[in-house]
């Protein structure tokens, strides 16, 4: 019996996207380990962090260097680094796009999933291995992967 590790997906998206954990569950059913724990603080986590740091008198630059900013960043980065695959679930903000770009720069398999055609188009999503517009398309792309091709 072989003990192959499951490929790891880092699911990227917005804290405000209530569909994140459901997509994560669907991906788990396909046999992947999916990291979406970043979603657990809730939709206002960034705003609460900002308010807290403002009360302390911190600038944005200082807040990035304080314990909360550093620990949250290191937590996410650790899991991004251990993942083989990145999936950006749209709509997503600046952080999500930075995370996807970082993963693409590491030559990991990366995908963008839209739930509908966007109003504003952008050619740069072509950096991803595929741009999908529904779960079926994403599932087809993921089925093409072989464990030996994942970094």
Predicted regions and their residues:
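Conserved catalytic or regulatory cores that recognize and/or transform ribose-phosphate-containing ligands
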Residues: 1-151
């Amino acid at each position: 019996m072989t003990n192959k590790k499951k490929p790891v997906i880092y699911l990227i998206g917005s804290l405000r996207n209530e569909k994140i954990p459901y997509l994560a569950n669907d991906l788990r059913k396909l046999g992947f380990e999916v990291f979406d724990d970043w979603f657990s603080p809730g939709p206002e986590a960034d705003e609460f962090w900002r308010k807290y740091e403002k009360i302390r008198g911190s600038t944005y630059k200082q807040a990035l260097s304080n314990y909360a900013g550093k620990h949250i960043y290191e937590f996410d980065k650790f899991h991004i680094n251990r993942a083989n695959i990145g999936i950006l679930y749209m709509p997503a903000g600046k952080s999500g796009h930075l995370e996807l770009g970082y993963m693409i720069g590491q030559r990991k398999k990366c995908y963008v999933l839209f739930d509908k055609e966007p109003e504003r188009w952008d050619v740069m999503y072509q950096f991803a291995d595929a741009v999908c517009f529904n779960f079926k398309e994403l599932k087809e792309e993921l089925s093409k992967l072989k464990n030996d091709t994942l970094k």
